[in-house]
Amino acid sequence: TTCCPSIVARSNFNVCRLPGTPEALCATYTGCIIIPGATCPGDYAN
């Protein structure tokens, strides 16, 4: 599960992923995090 701190970060993450960029790279670039579970922490609710 990818969790982002804002809607803007989520949008940027989604655009980053469009050409097939690895999830981990896009998460680092946008400030999002990748977690093993299904529930994002409160400060990464997007």
Curated annotation (Swiss-Prot):
It is found in: Secreted. Gene3D superfamilies: Thionin-like. Pfam families: Thionin. The keyword Thylakoid does not apply. Belongs to the plant thionin (TC 1.C.44) family. Transmembrane segments: none annotated. Keywords: Disulfide bond, Plant defense, Secreted. GO terms for cellular component: extracellular region. The lineage of its organism: Eukaryota, Viridiplantae, Streptophyta, Embryophyta, Tracheophyta. The gene is THI2. Disulfide bonds join 3-40, 4-32, 16-26. The function of this hydrophobic plant seed protein is not known. GO terms for biological process: defense response. Its main location: secreted. This is Crambin. InterPro entries: Thionin (IPR001010), Thionin-like_sf (IPR036391). Two isoforms exists, a major form PL (shown here) and a minor form SI.
